[in-house]
């Protein structure tokens, strides 16, 4: 019996569905080590995303404002291909790329309707990590 051969290469992964969304939400999670930008439709389905590491920065350079700017530009460009024009921005975290990411979303051509800070605040929950001594 002859060995089986594949007649064509199979692609793995999801098929890209072209959504046509005018309004959406932009979530910016800015930590001390990285910045992640996710752009969703009003229902919460992710249209595009980018992070400082995804854009090509490694190590301590991921935490810079410039890396956050590049990540936000990349996510905005992908979202605009799906027809996105207006976003509401939700910012979370204490990182250095918060304001830069918002500014670069505006510079990329997205109209920012509102900016909300959704950083979680504990009501004296978990014990924080020990103080750093340098």
From Swiss-Prot:
UniProt GO BP: translation
Pfam families noted in UniProt: Ribosomal_S11
Disulfide bonds: none
UniProt-recorded Gene Ontology molecular function terms: rRNA binding; structural constituent of ribosome
Transmembrane segments annotated in the record for this chain: none
GO cellular component terms, A-Z: ribonucleoprotein complex; ribosome
Ranges for region Disordered: 115-134
UniProt KW keywords: Ribonucleoprotein, Ribosomal protein, RNA-binding, rRNA-binding
Function description: Located on the platform of the 30S subunit, it bridges several disparate RNA helices of the 16S rRNA. Forms part of the Shine-Dalgarno cleft in the 70S ribosome.
Family: Belongs to the universal ribosomal protein uS11 family.
Subunit structure: Part of the 30S ribosomal subunit. Interacts with proteins S7 and S18. Binds to IF-3.
Name assigned to this protein: Small ribosomal subunit protein uS11
Source species of the chain: Corynebacterium kroppenstedtii (strain DSM 44385 / JCM 11950 / CIP 105744 / CCUG 35717)
Lineage, top ranks: Bacteria, Bacillati, Actinomycetota, Actinomycetes, Mycobacteriales
Gene transcribed to yield this protein: rpsK
């Amino acid at each position: 019996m002859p060995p089986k051969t594949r007649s064509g290469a199979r692609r793995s992964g999801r098929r890209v569905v072209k959504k046509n969304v005018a309004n959406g939400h932009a979530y910016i999670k800015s930590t001390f080590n990285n910045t992640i930008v996710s752009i969703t439709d009003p229902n919460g389905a992710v249209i595009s995303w980018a992070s400082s590491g995804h854009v090509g920065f490694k190590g301590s350079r991921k935490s810079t404002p410039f890396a956050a700017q590049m990540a936000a530009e990349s996510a905005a460009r992908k979202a605009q291909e799906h027809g996105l024009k207006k976003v509401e921005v939700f910012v979370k975290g204490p990182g250095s790329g918060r304001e830069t990411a918002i500014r670069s979303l505006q510079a990329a051509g997205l109209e920012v309707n509102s900016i909300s800070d959704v950083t979680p605040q504990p009501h004296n929950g978990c014990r924080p990590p020990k103080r750093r001594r340098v």
